[in-house]
Amino acid sequence: MLDIRLFRNEPDTVKSKIELRGDDPKVVDEILELDEQRRKLIIATEEMKARRNKVSEEIALKKRNKENDDDVIAEMRTLGDDIKEKDSQLNEIDNKMTGILCRIPNLISDDVPQGESDEDNVEVKKWGTPREFSFEPKAHWDIVEELKMADFDRAAKVSGARFVYLTNEGAQLERALMNYMITKHTTQHGYTEMMVPQLVNADTMYGTGQLPKFEEDLFKVEKEGLYTIPTAEVPLTNFYRNEIIQPGVLPEKFTGQSACFRSEAGSAGRDTRGLIRLHQFDKVEMVRFEQPEDSWNALEEMTTNAEAILEELGLPYRRVILCTGDIGFSASKTYDLEVWLPSYNDYKEISSCSNCMDFQARRANIRFKRDKAAKPELAHTLNGSGLAVGRTFAAIVENYQNEDGTVTIPEALVPFMGGKTQISKPVK
């Protein structure tokens, strides 16, 4: 959520930033109008409360002097009713303002390129060279079924479209990837490992920005009023919700693996085959809590942490800056990492790393103190995929496939695969 002071002090800046996302800047005028009404109500209410205190003194004086106090008692009752009415009006305006503010996205960093869609994202780095095959490469969805690594048909029977059973060495590869990623982030990148709740309440979803605007993208357990998480970013970031982080704790770096659940509303017809766009998938997440002056360097470091996984696995990728029309709701700046997939003859997103600045912290009330005597300040929060496991799985299978139908295991994964160096079709 944005600071109301930005609307008061820099309305034109806020309007231009909102317009860059393709949203209606008139919302700024709505907020300012409500804010003015609110301030007038507060002044009127304070004046009434001051008068009520004065009347209370007059009543006491009249009682001491045994004078008739009917008139001041009547005024006291009227003031009480009027104050109650003003408080009700103030509460209504507060709710209206919050309802509007919570749907306004974060302000975009000045260095984010302008554009309308992912076609306008800007490449800033490329690593590795896509492999030139001496045979016709297969798509990962064909390879995994031939090698008995996955079963999409039975998953559809059990759960519907966009689900998968990972079987045999497919399940082993998924588990190996998660273990490898978590191990690298904790032992080399300085993150603390967390196992997170995968059902969370509405306040938690609100804190990271999924609610109220994106409820259609979520799965909800109606009876309990809980939501399945779309990413471990949600419970990891909310770890410090409604807390003041004590001096010396920041920077705080968490990583965790979880299943992620997404309805994929609006993605009908896109990536309908394979592991690229499922309703349930595994992902290793990185979340950081930083002091404001450190968050931009932290974004670069976090993105490098994700890139290190791809480089050690030998997977060609590129880094792009998301443009103003493609960046997420809570982010001020986002880098996407896109891995090369031969079946698409293109790069596909495998990680998003974002600096949300104080946007999520204001919603979730996450503050920190620089020292014991300091006033609490809003922390900056960052999140990044490190990586999407299913997409990494698909990239390995496609980029490391062999003409005889086998798949070579990247060297970095061999210890996590029990020493296995190749995946072949099971004998039985």
From Swiss-Prot:
Q: Which GO CC terms are listed, alphabetically? A: cytoplasm
| GO molecular function annotations of the record | ATP binding; catalytic activity, acting on a protein; serine-tRNA ligase activity; transferase activity
Which pathway is it part of?
Answer: Aminoacyl-tRNA biosynthesis; selenocysteinyl-tRNA(Sec) biosynthesis; L-seryl-tRNA(Sec) from L-serine and tRNA(Sec): step 1/1
InterPro entries in alphabetical order: aa-tRNA-synt_IIb (IPR002314), aa-tRNA-synth_II (IPR006195), aa-tRNA-synth_II/BPL/LPL (IPR045864), Ser-tRNA-ligase_type_1 (IPR002317), Ser-tRNA-synth_1_N (IPR015866), SerRS_1_N_sf (IPR042103), SerRS_core (IPR033729), tRNA-bd_arm (IPR010978)
The answer to whether UniProt assigns keyword Hydrolase to this entry is: no
Q: What does this protein do?
A: Catalyzes the attachment of serine to tRNA(Ser). Is also able to aminoacylate tRNA(Sec) with serine, to form the misacylated tRNA L-seryl-tRNA(Sec), which will be further converted into selenocysteinyl-tRNA(Sec).
User: What is this protein identified as?
Assistant: Serine--tRNA ligase
